[in-house]
């Protein structure tokens, strides 16, 4: 096991931390001003009785949550709404693992492969291409592949909109307080938001799943040749 993977599992086995510079819901005058304002935001956990003082961070919101118990160790504006972007895919993977076997085959639709924004994260799959759920999850979690998020959503719920319903039901089940999903890949939508506290809950639940830990903890994955692509594709983990 490589050093990075060893470190990854060492970290998630004890404490899970989310410290995210989410996309702000309001735009500040300049990047410098926004960054400084974020740094100067109060840290709620510093006001707790008999609790150690935590550091200031430049993230708009932050949380440190103990992975086993869910105990909050550090909190900074943790329930504020933010746009989650690609960390949405943690929930996409969690809902997928709740509903699918890894060896199920998915035929990628035209909508799944062609509705994503030009230049966004992708592994260049095409209409009619067949991948398994497991292969799609590797591409989702290592390469943040947006067409794979769409294909998983359609495979499970018939449409991305209906899959978002499942995502929101899962969020409610986990106790999320300020989350609403409208798609599976995290591409911007005004009605697609979450908060640091909720993402900690979602990721804590995901890390309890052995398949999620295995897939998201890999350094790389080799995608086999498919019915539409004659060559293998090496997918590298872009997230650490």
Predicted regions: what they are:
Residues 203-240:
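Extracytoplasmic
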